[in-house]
Amino acid sequence: MLKRFLIPVLLFAGVHAIAQNKLDSYEQTIAGTNLSFKMVAIPGGSFKMGSISGGKEDEKPAHEVKLDPFWMGQYEVTWDLFEPFLYKDYEIAKSKDGKVAPEIDAVTRPTKPYLDMTFGFGKEGHPALAMTHYNAIQFCKWLYVRTGVFYRLPTEAEWEYAARGGAKTAYFFGDNDTQLGEYAWFKDNADQKTHVVGEKKPNPWGLYDIYGNVGEWTYDQYKADSYAEGKDKVLINPVVVPTTLYPNVVRGGAFDSAAADLRSAARGASDPIWKQLDPQVPKSNWWFPEAPFVGMRLVRPVNPPSHEEIMAYYDKKPIKDF
């Protein structure tokens, strides 16, 4: 039996009455800075999660999932937004008054990496990458302290639903991958590097780079047989709670992925080998020195839970690495 999330379900679901109302996309500004990011309204609804025919075994059985509406980042999180979280001095430099409020200063920040975590791919407009699952959640916490808005990682179900954009085919544009280069940076066209977000066409719901460029963290623990729980059922706002450090689900494929790994149903998983070069003992909670292909995208639920529930989500103690 899969363990389900113990923190109240409001963290991952909206109140039903609100869920019936139309959501509007918006741009989130960060007070005291010139930073902002765009969030796209994703309508609630039901869909078949997984692969009906073809695909890999961990994508089966296809099962019915019902989701409340939510907002999702129009783009993958870029270094422009992520770097002020990493370094207080950089955040001060980006602030309009040269100061950082005490409550912001109190947010735990990553240890300074010993490598160039851009891997030479580029910084301005490029997706932030190689952060751990824990690091990604702490970035969401920093945004919450900065904006007062609850941002989190998407669940695996939310990610696939949003990526499909209402389509039932292998890719949101059809079952054949011949058009993939119009929408995604992947092995055939990326030249082994990330690219500035938003250069390709968006999916039907206005999400850019949902396939390729960098893989994207979801909150869920990866279990190869997790879809069996949905057989002959309708799962409502499902999530598989992480109870071990590895593996967690990564979706969307990356710049070095084959076309088949960019399908809406394709599942990826984190691996301890991503820290093989990390000289620290124990391994860093913050960085994957051998994963320049994983990044993140934000989600915001329709109705926020209480501050205490939000902090319980953010402040789960990191699981010690090997």
What positions do the PLM features span?
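Sec-dependent N-terminal signal peptides
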Residues: 5-13
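Sec/Tat signal peptide C-region and signal peptidase I cleavage site
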Residues: 15-19
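Disulfide-stabilized, aromatic/cysteine-rich ligand-recognition loop
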Residues: 21, 201-203, 235-322
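Short, polar loop/linker segments at the starts of domains and inter-domain junctions
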Residues: 28, 49-67, 194-200, 262-279
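Mature N-terminal segment immediately following signal peptide/propeptide cleavage
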Residues: 33-49
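Active-site microenvironments of metalloenzymes and redox enzymes
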Residues: 49-51, 66-173, 220-227, 300-322
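Short glycine/proline-rich turn/loop motifs
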Residues: 62, 110-125, 189-192, 277-282
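Short, well-ordered junction/capping motifs at the entry into regular secondary structure
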Residues: 184-211, 241-244
